[in-house]
């Protein structure tokens, strides 16, 4: 079993999943980085998975497909950005040779956003970040994002590791602390992220349980978050979806 990631474009991530000779690249936005990642592990991925269609995640797909002869999978709702060979819509699990990858639709950041589940990990694309959630400026819908975060994402196992499409932790965590200045776990996570950066290391992945303790977008039901949001956005009602929509608007204004 192989699981690895590489950073590109400053804060994007591409991922490699492999079971024996069967391998997949996830979001190969930079083809050279993605192909080098596969080569470093001595595998030839036959599959490319997309969490959503934005170009910073799909821009390397054409070259990777040609280089590897790979099959491209993604949600057809995002086909305006890229052309999947296979649509993952309506499929709870993908059988990719020996790889078994769960599929959770999470529309919002884009209409076709999905989370992939594999061996205790959630590859969340731009739906859920460490300490934050994706914006909806480029074809997204804040209410659909809110319903995804309070519905299918909230239902996922808390033990899952979170592997997002970008590392925005050092930007997101202070926003959450501004809403909950007494959140000791959020402060500790920010300190750990900054320490890793100072040491030239990648941040350790969080778990969904940890995100539920530090990420305001997963804490819309918590009174301290709800009240802090309503002070800043009085138009927000008390329900969780309304709070997440207001959070997205507040975060966009930072």
Explain the meaning of each model-derived region.
Residues 1-41, 114-131:
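Conserved beta-strand hairpin/beta-sheet module of binuclear metal-dependent hydrolase folds
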Residues 55, 112, 129-130, 134, ...:
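Short active-site segment of divalent metal-dependent hydrolases/proteases
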Residues 9-10, 23, 30-103, 188, ...:
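Active-site HxH/HxHxD metal-binding segment of metal-dependent hydrolases
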Residues 26, 46-54, 71-76, 106-108, ...:
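Active-site neighborhood of phospho(di)ester-bond hydrolases with catalytic His/Asp-centered motifs
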Residues 17, 27, 52, 64, ...:
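Divalent metal-coordination and catalytic microenvironments
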């Amino acid at each position: 079993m192989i699981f690895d990631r590489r950073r590109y474009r400053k804060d994007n991530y591409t991922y490699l999943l492999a079971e024996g000779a069967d391998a997949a690249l996830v979001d190969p936005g930079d083809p050279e980085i993605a192909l080098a990642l596969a080569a470093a592990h001595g595998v030839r991925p036959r599959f490319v998975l997309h969490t959503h269609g934005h170009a910073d995640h799909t821009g390397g797909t054409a070259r990777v497909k040609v280089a590897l002869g790979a099959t491209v999978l993604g949600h057809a709702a995002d086909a305006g950005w890229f052309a999947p060979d296979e649509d993952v819509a309506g499929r709870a699990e993908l059988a990719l040779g020996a790889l078994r990858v769960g599929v959770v639709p999470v529309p919002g950041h884009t209409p076709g956003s999905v989370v992939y589940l594999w061996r205790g990990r959630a590859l969340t694309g731009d739906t859920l970040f460490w300490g934050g959630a994706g914006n909806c400026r480029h074809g997204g819908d804040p209410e659909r994002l809110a319903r995804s975060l309070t519905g299918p994402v909230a239902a996922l196992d808390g033990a899952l590791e979170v592997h997002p499409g970008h590392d925005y932790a050092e930007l997101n965590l202070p926003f959450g602390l501004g809403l909950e200045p007494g959140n000791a776990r959020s402060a500790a996570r920010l300190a750990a992220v900054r320490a890793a950066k100072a040491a030239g290391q990648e941040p350790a992945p969080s778990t969904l349980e940890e995100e539920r303790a530090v990420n305001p977008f997963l804490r819309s039901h918590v009174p301290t978050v709800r009240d802090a949001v309503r002070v800043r956005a009085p138009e927000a009602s008390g329900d969780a979806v309304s709070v997440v929509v207001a959070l997205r608007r507040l975060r966009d204004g930072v």
